[in-house]
């Protein structure tokens, strides 16, 4: 599984950071999935290997502008490029009204259908051939969700000795069983894939959080999770000065939660625009990492725009470079 940060700034962009967007794929950029779509996301995508033509679904965490203002431009650009495949948009109900209003009032149209799915439905679950997705309600000024991505249809290994012992010679049936399909033989026997195959590894699981001032809400979902991507808008001293109203997390809060939950990998993002990246800048973005490292002993990453990370099948997380 790979994910690329298209924007890591909170609220407003900076010279080096766009507002929120994240591209996720399983084994390559076809298909891929987008989590949030702040202003300028489609322009950020032009600097990556992802194409709007292969976008399978969008997952919107909440309705604040730094997470949705890029939607109309991206959707209409896909139409101008000739997209015809339907696109799933998993989002709060207001997002549909927002998109409809912009399309109607800008004399725009789409060449493909949008399938809106209410992210706030109590029984929410989405899946395709590659991923199953649930979500968790967070604590923010408006309803907000974290999305839990778990891979599906893991590769199976044939139990060849058992097949041979049961008189089933190598042939097309073996391939079907390995694909998870049950097979009906000419002699009337039904071969069940689960009886002749096994899955040798555990599914990879990633959580992508929206805005949230209470990381503990993710405690249950984090069981068995290999990567948590969570906002760290402030250092704790800034959070104390700002007060509770914005309902964001500090690096300290998230790090303490990740340590208590024994998360192996933590990636922080959504940094206040006050934090600078240039050498000598103050306050500097490295202060967020320094604060988190005081409380978290797992593998910590501070996301930057266009950083790409790969979660391997052995659950090791590392940065990759596709250039």
Curated annotation (Swiss-Prot):
Binding residues for Zn(2+) 1: 62, 64, 140, 211
The entry's keywords: Endonuclease, Hydrolase, Metal-binding, Nuclease, tRNA processing, Zinc
Any Pfam family matching the protein: Lactamase_B
Protein's UniProt keywords contain Zinc: yes
Cofactor: binding details: Binds 2 Zn(2+) ions.
Assigned EC number: 3.1.26.11
Catalytic activity: Endonucleolytic cleavage of RNA, removing extra 3' nucleotides from tRNA precursor, generating 3' termini of tRNAs. A 3'-hydroxy group is left at the tRNA terminus and a 5'-phosphoryl group is left at the trailer molecule
Annotated active site: 66 (proton acceptor)
Keyword Cytoplasm attached: no
Source species, domain of life: Bacteria
GO MF annotations, alphabetized: 3'-tRNA processing endoribonuclease activity; zinc ion binding
Similarity comment text for this entry: Belongs to the RNase Z family.
Subunit structure: Homodimer.
Listed name of the protein: Ribonuclease Z
Organism: Marinobacter nauticus (strain ATCC 700491 / DSM 11845 / VT8)
């Amino acid at each position: 599984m790979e994910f690329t940060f298209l924007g890591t700034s909170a609220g407003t962009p900076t010279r080096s950071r766009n507002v929120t967007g994240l591209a996720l794929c399983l084994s390559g950029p076809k298909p891929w999935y987008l989590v949030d779509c702040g202003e300028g996301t489609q322009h950020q995508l032009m600097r990556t290997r992802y194409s709007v033509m292969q976008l399978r679904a969008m997952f919107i965490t909440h309705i604040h502008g730094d997470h949705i203002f890029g939607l109309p431009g991206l959707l209409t650009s896909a139409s101008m490029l000739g997209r015809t495949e339907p696109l799933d948009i998993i989002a709060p109900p207001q997002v549909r009204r927002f998109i409809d209003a912009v399309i109607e009032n800008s004399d725009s149209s789409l060449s493909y259908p949008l399938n809106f799915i209410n992210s706030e439905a109590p029984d929410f679950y989405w899946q395709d051939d590659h991923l199953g997705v649930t979500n968790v309600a967070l604590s923010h000024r408006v309803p907000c969700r974290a999305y839990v991505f778990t891979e599906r249809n893991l590769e199976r290994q044939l139990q060849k000795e058992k097949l041979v012992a049961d008189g089933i010679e190598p042939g097309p049936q073996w391939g079907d069983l390995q694909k998870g399909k049950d097979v009906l033989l000419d002699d009337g026997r039904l071969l069940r894939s689960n009886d002749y195959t096994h899955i040798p590894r555990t599914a990879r699981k990633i959580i992508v959080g929206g805005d949230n001032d209470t990381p503990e809400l993710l405690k249950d979902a984090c069981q068995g999770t290999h990567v948590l991507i969570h906002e760290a808008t402030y250092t704790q001293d800034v959070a104390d000065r700002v007060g509770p109203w914005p309902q964001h997390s500090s690096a300290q809060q998230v790090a303490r939660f990740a340590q208590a939950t024994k998360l192996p990998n933590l990636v922080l993002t959504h940094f206040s625009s006050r934090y600078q990246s240039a050498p000598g800048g103050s306050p500097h973005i490295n202060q967020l990492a320094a604060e988190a490292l005081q409380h978290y002993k797992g593998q910590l990453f501070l996301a930057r725009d266009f950083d790409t990370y790969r979660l391997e099948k052995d659950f090791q997380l590392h940065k990759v470079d596709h250039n």
